């Protein structure tokens, strides 16, 4: 029998509200049309569980046992499970897998290795998804490719959570094409000269930061400053500049568009609060994930030819 990847799992449970009866006593009445998603330990019967979300009764959460089942089936195709976790206050779960048949890319300051990422959420933000996560092992930077959600399997978010693993050769073809397309852009970014004078402007574009007069108060009197960035954005711009100059692999990459983009991915993955990591900010559709995607588009715009 296989060991569980996750210590907890989820299930829908009925919801009740407390009501006051005419005689002054209280009782409980079921709330129809909705149910709660309860996360509880698989092995501790004393665990009363926690409610992680509330949904209409028509919504059925995909259990983590199903995610494990998919991962174990993929192991039979040659994948290796390399990581797993829960984020967003236990509302999102994921498993990462590697496969030696998927292509890598290596040059000075960079070594890219792809992983398959499968995940599901209990708040409706991710049904059941598979995508490609590329890791630069020089600096542990990550980037999710915008791949179709049917690379590894076809799935339906229903009570039975049915899925069908794609043909293995078809998996490799679709994944390989997406990865090689990304690598081609990476190589072109590495061949694109970058001038550090562009850093502040383009980092600000990634953040959506704008310079404008700011209202301040001193000695009880309000006044307006000269045009400036907000305090938060000013600090983030300092961090991004540090990442461009000092994060692992940057010197080896030289002054290239790839170095600039790598500064953003390093900042997004490593110069981040524990709270942001827990919220999933740097994966899928989180704030920092969107900033990575925006930086990628900006970097690509500098490619000539």
Protein language model annotation of sequence segments:
Residues 1-68:
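Feature for intrinsically disordered/low-complexity regulatory segments and propeptides
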Residues 53, 78, 103-107:
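A broadly used, surface-exposed interaction patch
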Residues 1-22, 100-305:
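Intrinsically disordered, low-complexity regions enriched in serine/threonine
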Residues 74-86:
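Short secondary-structure junctions
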Residues 83-102:
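Beta-rich nucleic-acid/ligand-interaction surfaces
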Residues 65, 91-93, 112:
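Residues at beta-strand starts and edge strands
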